[in-house]
């Protein structure tokens, strides 16, 4: 489904070159839930953004559903149609209702008729647990509700894979659970998911594999049971002692 080979992403400034992602090779299979953890600045979010073409890779290879993003002639917009992404910030249109937020991309990108787009939006609002909010505006919603709208909006495009970039980090603690529950349901339904998060409980419970990154490198990976109980690398052990 997703494969990266020796993926590197550099940023240059003040005469220095920084490797935000430094030679990451990984393979994510269909219906697999992969959780990426690591300290701040480890390259987790940059790696995720490379998968959706939001960051241009410096070198290496990204293949999503058979399409090679490292080939310059690749139409990234076609790839993005198949890859949903949910960010830390909800990025909803403040001047549009919840329903309109979910309908817009369906009509513009998927070319769906209004009636079909509305039906899809209402079904997804039911799925994420806020069907009664379709006429509300984002400012009237809690952070957890806004993030659930953002998830519904991404799902409305019928993606083959969902990317989550720290989806709960901007939420008040009591709202984290409602968003994680929606993500757990997606995992149970077989959605291919790559999740950058600090929620270790979610990683233990839902992930098929956990990837640990530090200083742009993939340091260690394994099943949750193996990763959390028998980590092999000293850097992994130190990180887990600090967060668990």
Kindly label every feature range from the protein language model:
Residues 1-224:
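ABC family nucleotide-binding domain
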Residues 214-215, 221, 225-244:
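C-terminal boundary and immediately downstream tail of ABC-type ATPase nucleotide-binding domains
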């Amino acid at each position: 489904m997703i494969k990266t080979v020796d993926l590197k992403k550099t940023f240059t400034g003040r005469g220095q070159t920084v490797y935000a992602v430094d030679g990451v090779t990984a393979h994510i299979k269909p219906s697999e839930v992969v959780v990426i953890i690591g300290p701040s600045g480890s390259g987790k979010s940059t790696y995720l953004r490379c998968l959706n073409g939001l960051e241009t890779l410096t070198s290496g290879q990204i293949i999503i559903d058979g399409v090679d993003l490292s080939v310059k002639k690749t139409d990234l917009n076609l790839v993005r149609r198949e890859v949903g992404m949910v960010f830390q910030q909800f990025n909803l249109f403040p001047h549009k209702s919840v329903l309109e937020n979910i309908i817009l991309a369906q009509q513009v990108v998927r070319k769906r008729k209004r009636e079909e787009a509305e039906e899809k939006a209402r079904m997804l609002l039911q799925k994420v647990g806020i069907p009664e909010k379709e006429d509300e505006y984002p400012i009237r919603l809690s952070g957890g509700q806004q993030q659930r709208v953002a998830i519904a909006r991404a799902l409305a495009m019928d993606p083959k894979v969902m990317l989550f970039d720290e989806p709960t980090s901007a939420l008040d603690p009591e709202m984290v659970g409602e968003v994680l529950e929606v993500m757990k349901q997606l995992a149970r339904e077989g959605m291919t998911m790559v999740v950058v998060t600090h929620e270790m409980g979610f990683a233990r419970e839902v992930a098929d594999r956990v990837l640990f990154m530090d200083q742009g490198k993939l340091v260690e990976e394994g099943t949750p049971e193996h990763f959390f109980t028998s980590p092999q690398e000293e850097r992994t052990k130190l990180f887990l002692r600090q967060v668990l």
